[in-house]
Amino acid sequence: MLKAGVFEPARQAPDFSLASSAGHELKISQYRGRVVLLAFGFTSCTEVCPTTLNTFALARRKLGPAAAEVQVVYITVDPQRDVPARLAKYLGSFDPTFIGGTGTEEQLAAVRKSYGISAEKKTIGNDYSYAHSSFTYLIDRTGRIRALMPYGHSPDDYANDLTILLKE
């Protein structure tokens, strides 16, 4: 049984085209045949985002060789700072297979809207941060959104759900 909230019925994950941290075009549809963890955040985040990405890395390790069939896709909410090279360095500190996506404000707003993600820029003195949705989409091998995992779940919960989706 999935630990995450289940989408019933499952729906196709909205596709998008962004610049990837690997230097090519990023589309969610390119990962058909693999299970995807899709999350949104930003590299300057100090709490939720690094905790989530570390959880993904630990969950993938628990899967052993099956981890090769899981792709983490992390879409920034901060295009001013999160250029592809910065995303690559940041994500690589958690797991070198993680892929980040960035684009223009307009492109990212459209992707967020299609996934129901909110992100609000907050000014803090001379700096800024973001308040944003912190759940993760679990997308199956056929590109369907199967579940939504809220922030705070353990690596074991993710490994459980990924194992179920990988067996389908």
Spans of model-derived segments:
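Thiol/disulfide oxidoreductase modules built on the thioredoxin-like
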Residues: 106-161
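Sec/Tat-exported extracytoplasmic proteins
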Residues: 11, 35, 60-67, 98, ...
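A short beta-strand-turn-helix
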Residues: 16-36, 60
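Short loop/turn microsegments at loop-to-beta-strand junctions
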Residues: 13-14, 36, 133-134
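Short active-site neighborhood of thiol/selenol oxidoreductases, capturing the structured segment around
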Residues: 28-56
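Structural microenvironment flanking redox-active thiols in thiol-disulfide oxidoreductases
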Residues: 51-111
